[in-house]
């Protein structure tokens, strides 16, 4: 960590205290690892007292300060009714595991921080976009606004947050949590950052939703009134993701990400088109191994 210009750390969750040169801080795992030579103050929201996870008839509200460890433990600790009625909770451990980080990081890193970093491979972005998460954002002028997480993360390291705005929470609607889901993820290395992460959802009304993250610079979500055919899905992927949108870094070339997204999307389509297995609520884990030439799913990290 190198922050030679920081002169003060203030415990506050009031956006009206923000001024140019400030940065909001929760767990600080990314902020401290990157460092800064421009920030003047850090506004620490960890003492805000927000309930980490709130269950209601509307769904699950996740506070921005909720740690990855708290979220990971939730499916087992949730009220019985939520465990029975929300099979999509099975996505939570899969997305948390996509960090492949130590327990020290899990106990400090926060859901809100991971989303606000705006990294293509951010697993909390993957989770919340796949389940139609809606962000609550507080502004320095005292107003608040809500927007889908799919519209909050807009590029590699870029979000739609205006200067001084603070992410308060993300709510996952009950309708999405009741859905049947499927999960696929790829990395070029055994413990590497996600290169492709695709999540499918089949809602109670038959709507099919496919969300692509990690492979693209921002989340891409496709919706169909029913499970599409293979050709329909492929055509919509090609229409929705142009060449410039595929992410390109050391964790995967755009061509590889494109090919594997098509492949994993078809696996998900076929899985959700088939009858649901009896009493199976959690999404299927990725299948076997991967390499750059003949890739198949493997564990990775952020």
Regions found by a protein language model. Give the residues of each.
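C-terminal structural segment of proteins
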Residues: 1-302
């Amino acid at each position: 960590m190198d922050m030679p210009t920081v002169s003060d750390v203030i415990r506050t969750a009031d956006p009206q205290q923000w001024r140019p040169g400030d940065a909001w801080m929760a767990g600080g795992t990314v902020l401290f690892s990157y460092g800064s030579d421009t920030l003047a103050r850090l506004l620490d929201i960890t003492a805000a007292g927000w309930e980490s996870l709130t269950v209601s008839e509307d769904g699950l509200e996740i506070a921005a300060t909720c740690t990855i460890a708290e979220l990971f433990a939730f499916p087992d600790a949730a009220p019985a009714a939520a465990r029975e009625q929300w099979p999509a909770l099975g996505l939570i451990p899969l997305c948390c595991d996509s960090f492949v980080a130590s327990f020290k990081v899990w106990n400090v890193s926060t859901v809100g921080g991971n989303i606000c970093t705006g990294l293509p491979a951010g697993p909390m972005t993957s989770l919340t976009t796949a389940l139609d998460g809606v962000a609550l954002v507080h502004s320095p002028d005292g107003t608040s606004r809500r927007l889908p997480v799919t519209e909050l993360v807009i590029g590699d390291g870029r979000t739609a947050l205006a200067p001084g705005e603070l992410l308060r929470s993300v709510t996952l609607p009950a309708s999405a949590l009741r859905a049947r889901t499927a999960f696929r993820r790829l990395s070029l290395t055994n413990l590497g950052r996600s290169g492709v992460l695709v999540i499918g959802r089949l809602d109670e009304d038959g709507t099919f939703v496919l969300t692509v993250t990690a492979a693209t610079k921002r989340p891409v979500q496709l919706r169909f009134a029913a499970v599409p055919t293979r050709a329909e899905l492929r055509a919509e992927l090609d229409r929705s993701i142009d060449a410039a949108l595929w992410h390109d870094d050391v964790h995967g070339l755009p061509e590889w990400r494109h090919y594997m997204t098509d492949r994993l999307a078809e696996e998900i389509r076929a899985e959700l088109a088939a009858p649901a297995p009896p009493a199976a609520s959690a999404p299927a884990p990725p299948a076997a191994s991967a390499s750059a030439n003949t890739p198949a799913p493997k564990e990775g990290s952020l």
